[in-house]
């Protein structure tokens, strides 16, 4: 899983700036259904800016696609000793999948009957996890009530 991502050219990436760029990009789509996106916190990591943009774009796109109208997708960054943690939290429409780990499997789509008007091959989260792993990071998902939280942990250098 992720062998195709051989090397990562690492430069300093301002994640807050990158996530705010993505927020601006996705806002028109979110506005159509009364959804909002917030970004709080800061953090700089060593990584490939384009690859990280793709990973976070996948996460944000899914958050907007699979959340009910008039809800907020909250992105929170926090630094600890050697890492930046990014939490992307949104309300789920329908039932949260029983096994969240499966969301990262290639071609897996959680109960397609819930997502009758969505497109996708089920590769986005698998690719996202590969990108995060190529950066020496971790990606996980957990349920908190009606919300799902995707957590990304990336090294600062």
PLM feature segments, named:
Residues 2-8, 44-47:
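Conserved micro-motifs of the catalytic ATP-binding
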Residues 4, 29-39:
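Short conserved segments within the C-terminal catalytic ATPase subdomain
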Residues 124, 128:
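Short alpha-helical Gxxx[C/S/T] motif in the catalytic ATP-binding
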Residues 63-64:
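Short helix-loop "hinge" at the ATP-lid/N-box region of the Bergerat-fold HATPase_c
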Residues 95-108:
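Short conserved segment of the HATPase_c
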Residues 70-82:
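Short beta-strand/loop element within the Bergerat-fold HATPase_c
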